[in-house]
């Protein structure tokens, strides 16, 4: 596969490169020993009582509400593979799970069920706990688990961040070791990013949102960059793809103006958003890469743009307008695009 010079790729779930798995697992095992765990230990079979679990779910209501439909879609992709989809909070406590009936009993034997903590300090090396510690997608397969009891599992997990980049939970697919598939982690990563985008759009529903990508057909998809601004142009936040395309961490972006980030004056872009909703324009990133962008402002009646601003729509705006087709569910086929920019 080739990569077109000067074109931003799609962001991986982790901004930093994935660590070498051998080192990652060795460090996780060392931490497991340091907290006093023994490989021969029997898993804790005492989940939170129902009232405590309900309270925990309520405290994580936004995560739970936005993750549930994504979990159902993900489970539909792996049904009948002796697997289950698991959602945890930021501490690794399972909030919800969906699984194949023939695997649920096996999962219960290792306490893989709601209300149980799968933090690394409680379960040793495992995909959920280790992904949360490392802050990156993680696979832990069979004998790589620290506790022998968990070596019947193969697990793929990705952390979930809130719209400000703080880890608030994790999404995991765990199953029988015989059902291991190398593409499972890709599905989990895509699903976690979908949850993050839903959380982002909900958090900034009343903000000015800029949807952008180097390729017009990716606007409105999982892979688009999203940047949110207050009506006065103050930068609020950006999703993973936007951070990757802009090439800067969130803290650095918060110190910059719209014009510094996109090469255009914010009032002009906002005016186009208000007067020609759905129209696309071309913006320039700090790297010099030109991207297709579409503004969105859900509460235009609450804001009056400065007088005298003209709409700066380009002559090719109609041609650049992305397809209105609904997004397809997460599938392996959608992930394997043959394009390095989708990696």
Features from the language model and the residues they span:
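PAS-family sensory/regulatory modules and their coupling/dimerization elements
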Residues: 143-144, 152-157, 262-324
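Amphipathic alpha-helical regulatory segments at dimerization interfaces
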Residues: 70-78, 130, 244, 260-268, ...
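Sensory coupling linkers of modular signal transduction proteins
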Residues: 171-204, 219, 294-343
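Short, surface-exposed beta-strand-loop junctions and turns on beta-sheet-rich folds
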Residues: 101-103, 242-245, 299
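Signal-transducing coiled-coil/dimerization helices and immediately adjacent hinge/linker segments
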Residues: 198-264, 319-343
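Intrinsically disordered, low-complexity terminal regulatory regions
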Residues: 1-142, 152, 161-164, 168-232, ...
């Amino acid at each position: 596969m080739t990569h077109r010079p000067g074109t931003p790729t799609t962001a991986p779930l982790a901004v930093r490169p994935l660590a070498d798995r051998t080192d990652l697992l060795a460090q996780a095992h060392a931490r497991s020993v340091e907290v006093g765990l023994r490989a021969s230990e029997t898993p804790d079979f005492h989940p939170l009582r129902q009232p405590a679990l309900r309270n925990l779910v309520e405290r994580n209501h936004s995560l739970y509400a936005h993750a549930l439909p994504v979990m159902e879609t993900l489970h539909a992709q792996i049904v009948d593979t002796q697997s289950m989809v698991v959602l945890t909070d930021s501490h690794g406590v399972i909030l919800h799970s969906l699984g194949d009936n023939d695997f649920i009993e096996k999962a219960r034997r290792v306490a893989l069920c709601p209300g149980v903590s799968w933090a690394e300090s409680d379960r040793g090396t495992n995909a959920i706990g280790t992904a949360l510690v490392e802050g990156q997608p993680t696979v832990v397969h069979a004998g790589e688990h620290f506790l022998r009891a968990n070596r019947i599992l193969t697990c793929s997990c990705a952390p979930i961040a809130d719209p400000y980049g703080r880890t608030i939970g994790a999404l995991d697919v765990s199953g029988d070791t015989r059902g291991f598939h190398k593409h499972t982690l890709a599905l989990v990563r895509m699903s976690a990013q979908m949850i993050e985008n839903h959380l982002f759009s909900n958090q900034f529903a009343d903000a000015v949102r800029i949807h952008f990508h180097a390729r017009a057909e990716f606007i409105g998809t999982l892979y688009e960059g999203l940047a949110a601004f207050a009506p006065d142009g103050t930068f609020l936040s950006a999703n993973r793809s936007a951070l990757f395309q802009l090439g800067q961490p969130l803290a650095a972006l918060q110190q910059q103006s719209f014009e510094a980030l996109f090469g255009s004056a914010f009032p002009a872009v906002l005016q186009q958003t208000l007067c020609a909703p759905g129209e696309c324009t071309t913006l320039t990133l700090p790297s010099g890469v030109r991207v297709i962008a579409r503004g969105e402002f859900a509460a235009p009646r609450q804001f009056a743009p400065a007088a005298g601003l003209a709409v700066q729509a380009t002559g090719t705006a109609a041609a650049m307008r992305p397809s209105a087709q609904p997004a397809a569910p997460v599938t392996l086929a959608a992930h394997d695009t043959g394009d390095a920019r989708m990696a």
